[in-house]
Amino acid sequence: RRRDAWAVLRESVLDRDFRTCRYCGWAKPPLHVHHVDGDPRNDALSNLMTVCPLCHACRHVGRTVSAGLGGIVETEGPRSPYLQNELDFVLRAAWDVGVFPTPSELGRAMRETGGVTELQAVGAEEVLHAVDEAARNGGTILLPAEWLFVPAGTFWEELLGKGESARCRRERR
């Protein structure tokens, strides 16, 4: 019964939010429903919001990193011009056109290698186009990019900019 009630509630949240991630504006499945206050027992509509898997993973970064599905990138020197929601949108756009392995393949690669897999580069034009699309589609600016969550095996070095030094470290929070 709880499962049925959750399915109905989930659909109402997705419909209310126009099946669009409220952080970055991504509007393709799969989409998740996030408990804003972090309490999975608080199913008040005001505590629920539609999020894409990447934005959801960022909100639960401790669990995501512990599961071996990603890492934390910290910039050293000037701040990255990219924000988390822009990075998420770019990564999803890349997956959507088949530039990267699927998220589940990335997760499997992380578990098998125990760390970041080989980085794959995407041309600057594709990145800029995807970030521009994010802005046009209502991507919300959340926080300055002092740190970013990135799934393992992605092109974070390219996104952080050639002039910056960055490192990826596995962190447990």
Give the ranges of each region predicted by the language model.
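Histidine-centered nuclease catalytic patch
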Residues: 2, 8, 12-14, 20-51, ...
